[in-house]
Amino acid sequence: MVPGRPAQRPGPAPRSRAAQEDGTLTLTPGAAADGPSDSAFLRACRREPVPHTPVWFMRQAGRSLPEYRKLREGVPMLDSCMMPEMVAEITLQPVRRYGVDAAIFFSDIVLPLKAIGLGLEIKPGVGPVVEEPVRSAADLERLRVPEPDELDYITRAVRILTAELGSTPLIGFGGAPFTLASYLIEGGPSRNYEQTKAMMFGAPDLFAAL
């Protein structure tokens, strides 16, 4: 033991990886730890000793993978996010190929906007586009709070994944309120957020309500 350094407890056994014919790696679920809470990723999150530096990548499930491009061919982005089996498969693809230390749930931050009754689509090369931006109290009134069962496709996908991932943790994410509000106000991506700033300073109560 190194003087002045706390004793480290043994970490979980290394992952079991097997090479496939196409050169990718297969992760054996459950080989790395007793469960997700004992994984290298969550150990590192808790600042506990780990057997190796855990690795995962931003956008690890996506256009860089040929299997992703094949699966998504002809399927609009928002539609793919609302198909539980497809969400699960896309989420699992980089785990199978690279043996990363965590899976990232395949989704998009604008799904809640779709659920509250807005006309919304993701245009290639542009991003989320809202048909009718929210810029007045009357606009705000037409929005509604979705029922939980209207988002059941997310729950179903998570259930599939937790059954398939074994000891590999699943990372979820969500859009911050300001980000989602700016999409609603601007009607899409913006460089200067002029409409958002105008509401923030000109109608602060409306902005807070939104």
Question: What is the meaning of each model-derived region?
Answer:
Residues Q8, Q20, Q60, Q93, ...:
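Residue-identity detector for glutamine
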